[in-house]
């Protein structure tokens, strides 16, 4: 059976890696992104029968329309991946403002909630899989990452809550919690000195950042039939970051 998968934030980075992996597994993929033109170009790269959508996950009406259009144009929905997100300011807490804090929560937490709610309506009679993207920032403490960490912790909790509620209608809900991933966005943070890659890699037991394809592989597993008895899980995909509890460097 050909599965229909909707992935938010699919135009670049982890989302694009997911779109490629899910398409390779035989899914028909709807690539949703705030940058609709970029999503359209990516859909062309994948080829038929994939679909591009412009969607703003911070806007409830836009999210509802995204789900409705996917269902209408692709005749259903089997998989939702809530991947869209924005970065934190990295400012000291005393310099952080409430507007930015609220914006980060709205994109990550509210967006995941609304998309999951609407996807569950579409999946109620057929079952399906929802995958949320949490983070090590939601499982451990990262200085200055207040809004981002709170949003990602909320996503982990909401994953478990929804998994318990919707299991009876055959909807599995899981999350992944990536660590540092070698995306273009992270590369910019390294280039501008906002993060120290060498220092961070010493803190990771596996000694390196993840490749986006490695995160996509974990995402596909949780959405695939291979994970048919897995729901309510938050899978760390962080090279051992959250497991390490010793002093000093973990590798190198």
Label for each model-derived stretch:
Residues 1-30, 162:
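Canonical Rossmann dinucleotide-binding motif of NAD(H)/NADP(H)-dependent dehydrogenases/reductases
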Residues 36-37, 55-65, 98, 213-214:
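The beta1-alpha1 cofactor-binding region of Rossmann-like NAD(H)/NADP(H)-dependent oxidoreductases
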Residues 91-93, 97-105, 200:
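Substrate-binding pocket helix/loop in short-chain dehydrogenase/reductase
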Residues 135:
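Residue(s) in the substrate-gating loop at a strand-loop-helix junction
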């Amino acid at each position: 059976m050909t599965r229909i998968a909707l992935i938010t934030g699919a135009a670049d980075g982890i989302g694009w890696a997911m779109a490629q992996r899910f398409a390779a597994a035989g899914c028909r993929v709807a690539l949703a992104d705030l940058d609709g033109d970029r999503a359209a170009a990516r859909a062309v790269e994948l080829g038929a029968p994939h679909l591009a959508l412009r969607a703003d996950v911070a806007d409830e009406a836009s999210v509802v329309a995204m789900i409705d259009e996917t269902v209408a144009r692709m005749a259903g929905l089997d998989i939702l991946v809530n991947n869209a997100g924005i970065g934190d300011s990295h400012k000291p807490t005393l310099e952080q403002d409430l507007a930015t804090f609220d914006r980060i929560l709205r994109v990550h937490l509210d967006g995941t909630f609304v998309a999951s709610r609407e996807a569950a309506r579409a999946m109620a009679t057929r079952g399906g899989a929802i995958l949320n993207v949490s983070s090590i920032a939601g499982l451990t403490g990262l200085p200055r990452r207040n809004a981002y960490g709170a949003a990602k912790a909320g996503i982990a909790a909401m994953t478990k809550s929804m998994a318990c509620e919707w299991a009876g209608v055959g909807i599995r809900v899981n999350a992944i919690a990536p660590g540092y991933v070698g995306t273009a966005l992270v590369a910019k943070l390294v280039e501008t000195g906002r993060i120290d890659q060498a220092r961070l890699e010493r803190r990771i037991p596996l000694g390196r950042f993840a490749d986006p394809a490695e995160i996509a592989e974990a995402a596909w597993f949780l959405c695939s039939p291979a994970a048919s008895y897995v729901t309510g899980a938050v899978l760390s995909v962080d090279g051992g970051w959250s497991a390490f509890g010793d002093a000093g460097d973990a590798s190198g």
